[in-house]
Design a protein with these regions (language model features):
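Alpha-helix-loop-beta-strand connector modules within alpha/beta enzyme cores
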Residues: 219-221
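Short acidic-capped amphipathic helix/loop micro-motif used as an active-site/signal-coupling element
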Residues: 71-75, 99-103, 179
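A short, well-structured catalytic beta-strand-centered motif of the EAL phosphodiesterase domain
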Residues: 46-83, 196-198
């Protein structure tokens, strides 16, 4: 098969180690995919809330909602299930669970909180109606909700995606771009989307106190 892919009159030397690595990756993916489906079927996907501090007062002013799987007494991070979730088309299922569960929990306080959404969510075209339903169900003020999108979504400029994000903004929901600066940064697109928050990529932040270039980039942003 490898020789055919290389073209006519070509050959490929079989390397058992090469295929054992591929096989190991395949088995790991299958295991992760099975774990994810088990978590979905058994209501094991839960929200974790990471506090966001005000740099001046050091007080928590809002929370970021993070997806986790709680299984067999262990907490599993997205690193172990995000790839199979994307390849299996299950990211919107996870997003809906995060929205529902975080809204239910946050209904008991007045903090603002952010939830991550993906390009897959926008491709399904369900967010506007679903979030409106959950806002009403849990009596959450739209101004408390922040939706985080990756920079790639906003810079891709798909008209339908931008239309959906604008509709969410019209509900009173805030928008944030996550990991800004990790891809091609389109400032014009930020203006088009009327973004409320920019979460600058960590590579610019981690050395901001010692690296003049990082400082200047962040200051410019």
């Amino acid at each position: 098969k490898q020789a055919k892919e290389l073209g006519k009159n070509r050959y490929h030397i079989f390397d058992a180690n090469e295929y054992s690595i591929d096989d190991s990756h395949r088995k790991a993916f299958i295991a992760a995919n099975n774990m994810l489906h088990h978590a979905l079927d058994n209501d094991q996907i839960i929200p974790f809330f990471q506090g966001i501090h005000d740099n001046k007062t050091n007080e928590i002013t809002k929370f970021e909602v993070l997806a986790r799987i709680k299984q067999d007494g262990k907490i599993i991070t997205p690193y172990h299930f995000i790839e199979p979730a994307k390849l299996s088309g299950l990211l919107p299922d996870i997003t809906q669970i995060m929205i529902d569960k975080s809204f239910k929990i946050m209904a008991s306080n007045d903090f603002s909180f952010s939830v991550n959404i993906t390009e897959d969510d926008l491709s399904r075209n369900y967010l506007n109606d679903f979030i409106a339903l959950k806002l009403k169900e849990y009596q959450i003020q739209p101004s408390r909700v922040i939706l985080e999108v990756l920079e790639g979504i906003s810079s891709s400029g798909k008209k339908n995606h931008i239309k959906q994000l604008s509709a969410l903004k019209n509900q009173g929901i805030s928008l944030a771009i996550d990991d800004f600066g990790s891809e091609y940064s389109n400032f014009e697109r930020i203006l088009d989307l009327d973004i409320d928050f920019l979460k600058i990529d960590a590579k610019y932040i981690k050395n901001i106190d010692t690296d003049p270039k990082s400082f200047e980039i962040v200051r410019a942003i």
